[in-house]
Amino acid sequence: MPSTGSTPILAHDVKSPHRGSLALDGGKTGYRVTVHREDRYEIIIGRGTLARLGELLRPVMAANEADSAVIITDNHVGPLYAELVTKRISATGAPVQCIVIPAGEPSKSIAQAHRLWDELRSRSVRRRTFLVALGGGVLCDLVGFVATTYLRGIPYVNVATSLMGQVDGAIGGKVGVDHSTGKNLIGGFYHPDLVVIDPSCLATLPLAEVINGLAEAVKVALIGTPGLFEQLERLPMSTAWPLDQAAPERLIEGLGPIIPAAIGKKLELLAPDPFEQDLRRLLNLGHSVGHGLEAATHFVRYRHGEAVAIGTATVTAISTGLGLTSVDTLRRILRLLQKLRLPVTVPDDLREVVWQHLETARLVRNGRLLLVMPTAIDHSVIIDDITRGQYDAACQLVAQEAPACG
């Protein structure tokens, strides 16, 4: 151990996707420790990537010296894709096991994480085993959380099969579970070793789940992605899904440029602050109100995207009331959200409890209620605070304007 100077100590496996260094500076009375971590991984986007999963995994497995895999999926996605994914991974020579959990937001819980820890222990999973999250945003969040906490961190791969997972949940390294008092209150940052996004998987989703993910794409458009809003306006939304067998194909074709654009914008915004230490985050557009709705209804009345859509409409109306957004812009946003079959109004019976959630957020953020508000179709700003009167007026304005925009 050095007594003076600064000594870097490199991670022992510099070939790993997760590299780091530690530097010491000090002497007999103590040390200053500086730790740097570097994570490197690829996000592979394209139709047919699921069929190439084994090929895509080989370099990841080699870098981690991984020798086995555990797929974690849910009872909706598993019957569709678990067999294919198992075959593709088995082709690499790695033994594969599969764990199936109940689908839906209630599985994103510490209780479910505990059950998965128990399963991994019972299956003698070691640090050279990698996990595969096969599913939507809930699976990606949950499996990432289990991966970072089990044995102090094992590798994992996100194979996102839902639009919400593809444009949001699988991207950025945020992992965690919900608490009974709020969404995503338990978790951290732990990047995957690979993200695989095959838009063809969207054809097997219920239309409601596709719509759920579209809300996040609208959010990304509004915070500053020129042209994305217009692409969303042109999306073909069939009322006959899935009876109209061509409808999923048309929608997937329309989403072709939207998925990488949404991912790219999210990563661009995360680049200067990947661990989100700054509370002023444009990516929170619609989420303050949205999380309030989800918590108030115990995560069962609204899908995440539906809650974000209502939150987006509400803060846009607040922005209109403040003179930051034109009524025409508000109407255009309401028109798109409703075209995508997303809800836009805070129900009367939930207005009070959502406001109380915002008040709680104010306490957590040192007395400041930070809200992201659109000022134009591709530009948003962050406002430091609003009043109860402004919130109530916005709820009324959305309720008033929405019928004519539907």
Swiss-Prot record:
Region of interest (Disordered), residue spans: 1-21
A GO molecular-function annotation: 3-dehydroquinate synthase activity
Note describing how the cofactor binds: Binds 1 divalent metal cation per subunit. Co(2+) is the preferred cofactor.
Reactions accelerated catalytically: D-sedoheptulose 7-phosphate = 2-epi-valiolone + phosphate
Domain of life: Bacteria
Native source species: Stigmatella aurantiaca (strain DW4/3-1)
Entry protein name: 2-epi-valiolone synthase
Alphabetical UniProt keywords: Cobalt, Lyase, Metal-binding, NAD, Nucleotide-binding, Zinc
Family: Belongs to the sugar phosphate cyclases superfamily. EVS family.
Binding site for Zn(2+): E216, H287, H304
InterPro entries hit by this protein: Dehydroquinate_synthase, DHQS/DOIS_N, DHQS_C
Keyword flag Cell division: no
Residue positions binding NAD(+): 105-108, 137-141, 161-162, 174, 183, 201-204
Function: Catalyzes the conversion of sedoheptulose 7-phosphate to 2-epi-valiolone, which may serve as an alternative precursor for aminocyclitol biosynthesis.
First-tier enzyme category under EC: lyase
PANTHER family (UniProt xref): 3-DEHYDROQUINATE SYNTHASE
Cofactor entry: NAD(+); Co(2+); Zn(2+)
Record EC number: 4.2.3.155
